[in-house]
């Protein structure tokens, strides 16, 4: 007899049902929009092996790998973890924190957005809430990340 699939638990762990029967799109955790070359290689390898070679870049600096079969979910999570890539979340939870490049890279950056995004993510990511909740960190007055479009938006600034 086939195992019963717990769709709610899968969604909580970042696996969203697709219209194709037995297939899921996996949302990955990409904190502050930052990935290492090793992370990108891992995502590409997993996508080639389990996701038809397709990767979707989301509007919130995230990555999704569609076409993952239900029977491959555990091995996909294991292979991603080996490459330092975590799964995201869906539903009424704190989502992965987004951030611009900040003072480490951008000439206009006033704050270290990536460190702040990591700290917020470590503290709040995945917490259950009544509704999905989003943080965004932008490093300066240019507001390239559009901080006000998040539930909590942080903007770097200067005192003159």
Give short role names for the model-derived ranges.
Residues 1-42:
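N-terminal basic/disordered segments at the start of proteins
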Residues 26-159:
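Small-residue-enriched alpha-helical segments and adjacent helix-cap loops
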